[in-house]
Amino acid sequence: MINNTNSNISIKAVGKKIRISPHKMRKVIDQIRGRSYEQALMILEFMPYKACNYVLKLLSSVAANANHNFGLNKSDLFIEKIIADGGPKLKRFQPRAQGRGYPILKPTCNLMIVVKVKS
């Protein structure tokens, strides 16, 4: 999605059904919210969490979109908005004794990143 008003360009990328809980994803995205693209890359590269790989992949995608579609320089971008919401839950069952089964809900999350050009 592209919003272009008064030469304020914001570029958005969305990742859906990512197999990690939104709680774990928010632990990572809170560290990079409002930072520049280059600072966010540095932070994500050295954080020891699984969620960093998903955020890094989507962040590089939104930067590539900005570069390809608008010719914007990646070093001029900063993260305006980043949100991790809950996605659909995968429903599984754990077999238990005497024919019972306990439900297991495996969470997924939807990640949205919006970047803007530094003014």
Curated annotation (Swiss-Prot):
Record-annotated disulphide pairs: none
Pfam families associated with the record: Ribosomal_L22
UniProt keyword Nucleus present: no
Database matches in Gene3D superfamilies: Ribosomal protein L22/L17 (3.90.470.10)
PROSITE patterns: RIBOSOMAL_L22
Alphabetized GO MF terms: rRNA binding; structural constituent of ribosome
Compartmental location: Plastid, Chloroplast
Entry GO CC: chloroplast; large ribosomal subunit
GO terms, biological process: translation
Keyword terms of this UniProt record: Chloroplast, Plastid, Ribonucleoprotein, Ribosomal protein, RNA-binding, rRNA-binding
Quaternary state and interactors: Part of the 50S ribosomal subunit.
Family named by the database record: Belongs to the universal ribosomal protein uL22 family.
Known role: This protein binds specifically to 23S rRNA.
Name by which UniProt lists this protein: Large ribosomal subunit protein uL22c
